[in-house]
């Protein structure tokens, strides 16, 4: 294995917190493979680059010679992770968990090394748990400690309901670490309480406590909100190569270094060089996005696919060409009492926007074109004739043909 300091340089790159860092150093000094834990409740069958951030870090651990345990929350998903929530999360059924987990693991293995990955389901030890064991675990935690969590504290002080079963979630996640004897547990920066609970429980059970390592939440392509399907700012791991490349090209310049560090396969030295280029003003954002797009497409679709996607992008957008596969829609163009059509509703119907709110934001930002002509900002209503057999476009990747 590499010297401890060289391993730490890789491990700490892009992380938010490592608690405690000295403890991680001591574990690495043993010069034996560590067991790196990531627990996931597969609430959705499809992953995006935001989900891939901790998986990429786990792959770095694997490349350093360590092992990974991926815990599928077949037990905890029946409760629903309350982290970062202002209301009770609807629990998943066992059938939903199983179906989503299969797709999740298949996509995760595009990133992880299967030879160094163990996949387990925490339902295997949670579901058979008897009352005596459950009460013993719950006695290790106090309500006062649980209410230290920001999300629970906010809900409590705002008099929003907190179901009793939600208190159990961090207890069971902590118990997962005991069962698999985790050396390091990873999660998003909204998971720090749960990760530290695992440390405490392991210590109470006379085990060497795990290290808590958190990763930042990836900002979406809009450069403001976290990446999420609900915000329409995501890059899916199963997106077609051309779509994936086009979405990378649409990210805002200021988040390019973050995307390189959290989503690419570049070395630490290469990442540091990109950071310096932004600091000293020598960066070429356009070329950096092209290289990033190639790298990400190659990672998820195979070597050489990035260049093909770049060529398709150049042919389409440099020459202002309309894609060959624009989806066609037949919709009703019913005017209101003023003889006008509310455009945001149409944009949702043709799948250019996921909601009226997103459609209005696209219009406000000047991001909509009709027949390849920019729509003036704040233009929410248009005459029916404007939309007859119109070609609608949002940015560089969303198109719709009305017929």
Q: What is each model feature region?
A:
Residues 71-73, 120-122, 215, 331:
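Conserved beta-strand termini and adjacent loop/short-helix elements that scaffold enzyme active sites
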Residues 18-82, 184-192, 198:
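N-terminal catalytic cores of NTP/NDP-binding nucleotidyl/phosphoryl-transfer enzymes
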